């Protein structure tokens, strides 16, 4: 069973930052910009397993943009990403947002389509990765 907590950055940083570093910088070898000054303004979703181990995280900016989705490899395709999205989307609805948006690597677009997101605009390249902007009406 997966439990998702919605946290501010002060609460989330000790667990979300190391997970994002492990997934984005070490495993995916990105440029290390997975933490930024916007984290403090975001709502953070953190997923835990039954033992209390952090297995996933994502964030939502005040404008409804979701990003920094990271799930531990052995927990992928087990509903963790969907649970993180559901928690952030529920929070967006409570805040009266009309929609949420995100930009994802092209190979992940199918997952987000299955969660009700629709592609917006053309595929573009960022950091050497093909990306797709997507939006979901609430």
Residue ranges and their predicted role:
Residues 1-55:
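Short amphipathic alpha-helix that is part of the acyltransferase structural core
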Residues 20, 112, 117:
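Conserved active-site tyrosine of GNAT-family acetyltransferases
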Residues 41-45, 67, 130-134:
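Short beta-strand micro-motifs in enzyme catalytic cores
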Residues 46, 52-70:
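Conserved beta-strand in the GNAT
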Residues 75, 79-87:
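Conserved acetyl-CoA pyrophosphate-binding loop and the N-cap/start of the following alpha-helix
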Residues 92-105:
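Conserved GNAT acetyl-CoA-binding A-motif
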Residues 103, 118-135:
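Conserved catalytic-core motifs of GNAT/GCN5-like acyltransferases
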């Amino acid at each position: 069973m997966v439990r998702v907590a919605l946290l501010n950055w002060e609460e989330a940083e000790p667990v979300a930052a190391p997970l994002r570093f492990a997934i984005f910088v070490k495993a995916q070898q990105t440029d290390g910009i997975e933490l930024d000054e916007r984290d403090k303004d975001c709502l953070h979703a953190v997923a835990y397993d039954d033992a209390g181990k952090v297995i996933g995280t994502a964030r939502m900016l005040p404008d409804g943009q979701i990003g920094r989705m990271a799930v531990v490899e052995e927990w992928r395709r087990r509903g963790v990403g969907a649970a993180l999205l559901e928690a952030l989307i529920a929070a967006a609805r409570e805040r009266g947002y009309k929609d949420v948006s995100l930009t994802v690597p092209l190979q992940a677009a199918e997952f987000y389509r299955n969660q009700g997101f629709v592609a917006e605009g053309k595929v573009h390249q960022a950091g050497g990765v093909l990306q797709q902007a997507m939006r979901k009406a609430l």
